[in-house]
C-alpha cells in the first residue's frame, strides 16, 4: 500500500501538526466506505466520503496500523499537485452566446443560474474581477482546507478539514497564498466580471472558491469537489468546476484515486473541466517493451537525465509504471564529464531501497559510504502494487556536493525488466530524458512529449482542456505592445500537453486560448 512510503518522500503532502500530533492527509480505500469506526478509534479524522473510499487526516504514527485493518484495502498518502494555465472571448465565440438573444438564441448565456466552482491557490478574494458593478462580491462562499478561522463544514455527517466563509465574510479575507497569482488568473478567465474591455467567460455565474493555499494536494482537491457540489445541490443550480492543477506522476490510465473521484462526481454532480498541462515539447516520457532477458551488464534501455549534474546539486524524481504485475528495476549511473566513464553506479533496484548519503548518516541502515565522500542527500526507491494491478517503481534523487572541487557528474538511469514487460516512465521534476553517447555497454535514448498530459485528465466523465494561441500580441502595463511572431494565432501552443495514454485514449478533448491571456493578478 501507499502507506509503506516514507512520509519524507517529496511527492507527498507535508506533515501537519494538529493538537501537538503529526498528521498527514490520505485517501483510504475501504471495502465498506461507511465502516470507519476503527479508523477514528486510531486517531483518524474522516473527511469526505466517496464510493469505496474516504479522505482523512491520520496520525503518522498510526499509518501502518490503519493500513492493516481488515476493512482497509489501501492507504494512499496525499500527493502534491502543480499549477497548469478581450480576444479570448471573441475567438471562442463566447461573446456570441453571451449576447444570445441578439443572435436568435433562446437566452443570453453568461453563466447566470450556474454555480462556477474554482479549485486553486493564490486567490485575491476582493479583486474587482469578482465583484458586480456596485462593488458587491459575486463570491457566494469560500472553502479553505488549510484555514480554521471560519465556520466548520459538515457534509454527510463528517467534518471537512479547514473551514468556510460565506459572502458576508469575504471582505475580511485577503489571499490564501501571497506568493502565487494562479488562482486569481484562472478564476477570472472562467467567471470574472466585466473590467474595462476584459471579462471572464461566465460573468453572470455564482462563484464558489476553494482556495488550497500551501496545501495543494489531491486529498484537498477531493474535499473541495465535495464542498462545491454540495453547495450547488443545496441551492438547486447546475455546477461547472474548473481545476488547473495536476500531476506528472501516476499511471495515466484513469485509475488513480483522484481520477476515480472525478469519474464519480462527473456522472451527475458537475461538469468538471481539467487542464491537460503545460509540458508539451518537454522530453519527459519513455515508453518501452523489453525484448530478451536483461542482465546487470546488458540493459536494453536507459536515458541521461538532463539538468542533473550532481556537482551542482541533482534533485529529481522518476515515476515508472509496469503495464503488468512484473516490476521494472532501475539503476542510477554517475558519469564523469571529462572522459564519459562510469564514476559510480547503484545496483539494480526492484524493491524498496534507500541510500542515506552524507555526514551524520553513518548510523542509518542503507548508509552509502562511497557517495558520502562527495555528497549529502539521498537516493530512494519505492516499489508498490497499485489499484490497477500494475507495479509502480518510484524514485527520488537528491545529491548536493560537499565541496567545490566535486565534479559535475552527469546522472543517468537504466531500466531493467523481464522479456515482454512493457512500461511507461516520466521524469517528474524540471528535467528531461535525453540521448547520451554510449558508455561501456550502457546505451541512452531520447525521451518524448508524446504522453505529457496531467495524469488526472485520464479518467472518465471529465473534459480535458489543452491550449492554443488565441493572440500573439498584447499591451503591457507600460503601454508598450508586446508581440511574438513565433506562435501564429490559432495554432496549438507548443507547451500544451497531449498524448495517447496507456489506456488508449487521446488527450486533450478540447483546446482553449492559453497563450498571452490577459487576466487578473493577485494584489498581495
Predicted regions, residues:
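Hydrophobic beta-strand segments within beta-rich accessory/binding domains
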Residues: 25, 300-331, 401, 409-431
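Short acidic, glycine-rich surface-loop motifs adjacent to enzyme active sites
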Residues: 211, 228-253, 275-276, 412-420
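Mobile, glycine-rich extracellular loop/lid and propeptide segments
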Residues: 39-40, 50-69, 188-191, 199-203, ...
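Autoinhibitory N-terminal propeptides
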Residues: 1-106, 115, 128, 303
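Extracellular S/T/G-rich loop segment that most often corresponds to the catalytic His/Ser-adjacent loop
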Residues: 143-162, 267, 283-392, 445-446, ...
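Active-site core segment of subtilase-fold serine proteases
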Residues: 107, 123-184, 200, 338-434, ...
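Catalytic-core regions built around general acid/base machinery
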Residues: 257-269
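Subtilisin-like serine protease catalytic core
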Residues: 101-220, 236-237, 269-271, 283-284, ...
Amino acid at each position: 500500500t501507499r502507506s509503506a512510503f516514507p512520509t519524507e518522500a517529496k511527492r507527498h503532502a507535508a506533515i501537519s501538526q494538529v493538537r501537538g500530533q503529526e498528521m498527514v492527509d490520505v485517501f483510504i480505500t475501504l471495502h465498506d466506505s461507511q465502516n470507519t469506526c476503527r479508523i477514528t478509534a486510531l486517531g483518524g479524522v474522516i473527511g469526505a466520503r466517496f464510493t469505496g473510499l474516504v479522505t482523512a487526516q491520520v496520525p503518522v504514527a498510526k499509518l501502518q496500523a490503519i493500513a492493516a485493518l481488515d476493512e482497509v484495502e489501501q492507504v494512499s498518502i496525499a500527493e502534491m499537485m502543480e499549477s497548469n494555465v478581450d480576444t479570448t472571448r471573441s475567438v471562442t465565440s463566447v461573446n456570441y452566446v453571451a449576447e444570445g438573444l441578439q443572435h436568435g438564441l433562446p437566452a443570453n448565456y453568461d453563466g447566470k443560474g450556474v454555480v462556477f466552482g474554482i479549485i486553486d491557490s493564490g486567490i485575491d478574494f476582493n479583486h474587482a474581477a469578482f465583484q458586480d458593478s456596485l462593488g458587491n462580491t459575486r463570491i457566494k462562499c469560500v472553502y479553505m482546507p488549510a484555514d480554521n478561522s471560519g465556520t466548520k463544514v459538515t457534509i454527510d455527517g463528517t467534518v471537512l478539514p479547514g473551514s468556510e466563509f460565506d459572502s458576508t465574510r469575504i471582505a475580511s479575507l485577503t489571499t490564501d497564498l501571497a506568493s502565487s497569482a494562479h488562482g486569481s488568473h484562472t478564476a477570472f478567465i472562467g467567471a470574472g466580471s466585466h473590467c474595462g474591455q476584459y471579462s471572464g467567460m461566465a460573468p453572470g455565474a455564482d462563484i464558489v472558491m476553494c482556495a488550497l493555499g500551501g496545501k495543494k494536494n489531491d486529498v484537498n482537491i477531493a474535499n473541495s469537489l465535495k464542498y462545491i457540489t454540495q453547495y450547488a445541490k443545496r441551492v438547486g443550480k447546475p455546477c461547472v468546476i474548473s481545476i488547473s492543477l495536476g500531476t506528472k506522476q501516476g499511471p495515466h490510465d484513469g485509475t488513480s484515486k483522484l481520477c476515480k473521484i472525478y469519474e464519480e462526481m462527473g456522472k451527475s454532480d458537475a461538469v468538471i473541466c481539467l487542464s491537460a498541462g503545460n509540458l508539451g515539447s518537454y522530453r519527459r516520457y519513455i515508453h518501452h517493451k523489453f525484448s530478451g532477458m536483461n542482465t546487470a551488464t546488458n540493459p536494453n534501455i536507459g536515458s541521461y537525465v538532463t539538468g542533473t549534474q550532481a556537482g551542482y546539486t541533482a534533485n529529481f524524481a522518476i515515476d515508472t509504471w509496469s503495464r503488468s504485475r512484473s516490476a521494472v528495476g532501475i539503476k542510477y549511473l554517475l558519469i564523469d564529464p571529462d572522459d564519459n566513464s562510469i564514476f559510480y553506479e547503484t545496483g539494480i533496484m526492484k524493491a524498496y531501497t534507500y541510500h542515506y548519503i552524507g555526514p551524520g548518516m553513518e548510523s542509518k541502515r542503507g548508509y552509502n559510504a562511497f557517495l558520502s565522500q562527495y555528497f549529502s542527500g539521498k537516493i530512494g526507491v519505492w516499489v508498490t502494487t497499485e489499484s490497477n494491478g500494475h507495479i509502480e517503481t518510484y524514485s527520488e534523487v537528491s545529491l548536493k556536493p560537499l565541496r567545490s572541487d566535486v565534479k559535475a557528474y552527469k546522472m543517468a538511469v537504466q531500466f531493467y525488466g523481464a522479456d515482454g514487460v512493457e512500461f511507461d516512465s516520466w521524469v517528474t521534476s524540471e528535467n528531461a530524458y535525453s540521448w547520451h553517447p554510449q558508455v561501456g555497454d550502457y546505451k541512452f535514448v531520447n525521451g518524448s512529449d508524446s504522453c505529457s498530459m496531467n495524469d488526472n485528465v485520464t479518467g472518465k466523465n471529465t473534459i480535458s482542456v489543452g491550449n492554443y494561441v488565441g493572440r500573439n500580441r498584447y499591451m503591457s502595463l507600460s503601454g508598450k505592445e508586446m508581440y511574438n511572431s513565433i506562435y501564429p494565432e490559432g495554432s496549438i501552443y507548443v507547451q500544451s500537453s497531449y498524448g495517447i495514454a496507456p489506456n488508449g485514449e487521446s488527450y486533450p478533448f478540447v483546446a482553449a486560448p492559453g497563450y498571452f491571456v490577459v487576466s487578473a493578478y493577485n494584489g498581495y
